[in-house]
Amino acid sequence: MSTPTPSRRDFLRTLGASAVALSASRGAMASPRRPGGRPPNILVIVSDDQGYRDLGCCGGQTIRTPHLDGLAGDGVRLTNFYVTWPACTPSRGSLLTGRYPQRNGTYDMYRNEKPDYGYKYPPEEYAVTPERILGMDTREVLLPRVLKQAGYRSGIFGKWDLGQLRRFLPLQRGFDDFYGYVNTGIDYYTHERYGVPSMYRNNEPTTEDKGTYTTDLFQREALRFMQENRDRPFLCYVPFNAPHIASVLERPRPVQAPEAYIESYPKPKSKDEARRVEHMAAVTAMDDAIGELLALLEELELADNTIVVFFSDNGGSGTADNAPLRGRKGQMFEGGLRVPCMVRWPGAIPAGTVCDEFLTSMEIFPMLCNAAGVAPPDGVVLDGFDMTPVLAGKAPSPRKEMLWQRRGDRAARVENWKWVESAKGSGLFDLSTDIGEAHDLSKEQPEVLERIKARFAEWTQEMAEAEPRGPFRDY
């Protein structure tokens, strides 16, 4: 039996109500605070290319993630949570700006493609390649700069990916402390991207920890930062590179993990199983690092006044488990865009809950601004809203639509309708009954398809008319 077709009036009313709700919710509710008025600390953890079911709490049966499972048990697990792009750079840009990639200007990757074909850049050539010289428009206002209004100290430990030149680096964008790498992927031990050293401390390149596993380094630096700033509000942003494949010239590129973690899983019987074990071991190593961060919050008696957010930057790749979703990283199907997410905020969000509401990573920026008691930047259009009432179970999500574009690939979700037009496949799907996007309803629901395409065209025009941002726009 086919799903009833909404009238055009109902369809437009849905979109109008969505816009009004998004606008109104930016006023948001007051956040709970400790006695004395100290705003909550913030710990944002992002994994890299983790699958939708690569967590025990998300139904994974083969991978050990006790600390993330515990985090879900102490807070809320989001099942209907999306990122803004099916790969890393634009997704991270949206997290830190609260804006669509097409609005903030970072709507594609800053990367070189020759290494995909075995080419190693000499230093002089690498210095003028897109990966080296592109970065997020310096007019964009990032989250740490806004939080400074409330006295926050902000640190990032892990993958930056928003530009390598000094003007693009974290300290120039509002962060106070940075240790990590500046591009899309590295070797977990040499810290090189296809032979190019890529680790930085603050504004300077460093090879001080070459040979040490990156997950351990990012854990170490995040622990240091939280210790040093325990007496003031802080934003600790920990974007791990796990379980992304290592950026090495050899193929197939491995996911690197410490031998002890690999050996903790059953011995693989094939090359494919071995690659899956590497992936699982990297996730479990990251989970242990996250466990150390959460344990320190308890030790410092900060856990009750700290918001913890975890999600994957995009859908899983390689041997990641995206079931029951269709597709993976780089694709416009659910497996490239819908990701695992959980939020813990004692006093504001009930523990042990599950939220099935339609939400996105663009809701994080306004949520954290409101939690800190600071206003979003003047004159900046945000594309999200404070999702605290939704996570607390006090209100339905006002989000009714989400739109995506990656070069020639396009997709939109309106209510439970999902439209995809891409090189990997196209169709119209009813996510309320078909989360795996297996049944194309384009022929059965031509009016719905036409209306979603019309809405996408309107959104495209809206993005084109927004104040232009580099590095890709012509202005």
Residue ranges and their predicted role:
Residues 2-19:
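N-terminal secretory signal peptides and thylakoid transit peptides that target proteins
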Residues 25-44:
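C-terminal segment of N-terminal export signals and the immediately downstream linker at the start
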Residues 36-40, 47-63, 70, 79, ...:
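Active-site-proximal cap/lid insertion segments
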Residues 72, 148:
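Anion (oxyanion) recognition and catalysis
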Residues 77, 153, 418:
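Residue-level detector of anion-binding/catalytic polar loops
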Residues 104-143, 201:
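His/Cys-centered metal/cofactor-coordination and adjacent catalytic loops
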Residues 144, 225, 408-420:
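Short, surface-exposed beta-strand/loop micro-motifs that present aromatic residues
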